[in-house]
């Protein structure tokens, strides 16, 4: 039985029911349906903090999913898990891969900026202001891209860009 069928969360159950109805009425292949089931189960496991299970489901969804747009969200979610696990290099790789397939993911740009900013802060703590500035400059570029895609969002990032004189 798919994980999403046994999840006790009302929102997850509602999402699963709606998704099942849509899968019945929208013409899709069996592979697309199976990919979506794995993706949905991955999201369910991820929301509960079961990252290993979520990754297994996402990797299986990636194997089956052929649509680049849908693949971008799978890759993005894999990046989120690696970010949560502190595996920032891997996370950046998955965010890049997601953006290759869908350049309109402001949340991926934002998460990449957050990682770069964090690395800049680490460099300051280690006394390397030159490396810190390079990381901060990279964070600024990613935040600018996120803001360009969704101008009303990322207010804190916009303020940081203004305060640090990185916003044009």
From Swiss-Prot:
Q: Which SMART domains match?
A: TPR
- PROSITE patterns to which the protein is assigned, alphabetical: TPR, TPR_REGION
Q: Which Gene3D superfamilies match?
A: Tetratricopeptide repeat domain
The reply on keyword Nuclease is no
Q: Which UniProt keywords apply?
A: Chloroplast, Membrane, Photosynthesis, Plastid, Repeat, Thylakoid, TPR repeat
Give the main location: plastid
Question: In the UniProt record, does the keyword Chloroplast occur?
Answer: yes
Any one GO BP annotation for this protein: photosystem I assembly
Q: What subcellular compartments does it reside in?
A: Plastid, Chloroplast thylakoid membrane
**Job description of the protein:** Essential for the assembly of the photosystem I (PSI) complex. May act as a chaperone-like factor to guide the assembly of the PSI subunits.
Q: Which family does it belong to?
A: Belongs to the Ycf3 family.
Name of the protein described by the UniProt record: Photosystem I assembly protein Ycf3
The organism's superkingdom is given as Eukaryota
The record, for Pfam families, names: TPR_1 (PF00515)
NCBIfam families in the record: PRK02603.1 (NF002725)
User: According to Swiss-Prot or TrEMBL, what is its membrane topology?
Assistant: Peripheral membrane protein
What's a GO cellular component annotated to this UniProt protein? chloroplast thylakoid membrane
Q: Show me the TPR repeat boundaries.
A: 35-68, 72-105, 120-153
């Amino acid at each position: 039985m798919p994980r999403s069928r046994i999840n006790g969360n009302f929102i997850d159950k509602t999402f699963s029911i709606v998704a099942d109805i849509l899968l019945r009425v929208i013409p899709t292949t069996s592979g697309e349906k199976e990919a979506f089931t794995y993706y949905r189960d991955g999201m369910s496991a991820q929301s509960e903090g079961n990252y290993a299970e979520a990754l297994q489901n996402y990797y299986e969804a990636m194997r089956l999913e052929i649509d680049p747009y849908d693949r971008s969200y799978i890759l993005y979610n894999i990046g989120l898990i690696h970010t949560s696990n502190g595996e920032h290099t891997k996370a950046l790789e998955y965010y890049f891969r997601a953006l290759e397939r869908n350049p309109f993911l402001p949340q991926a740009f934002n998460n990449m900026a957050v990682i770069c900013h964090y690395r800049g802060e680490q460099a300051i703590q280690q006394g390397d202001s030159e490396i810190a500035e390079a990381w901060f400059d990279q964070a600024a570029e990613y935040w600018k891209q996120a803001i360009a895609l969704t101008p009303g969002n990322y207010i804190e990032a916009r303020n940081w860009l203004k305060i640090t004189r990185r916003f044009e």
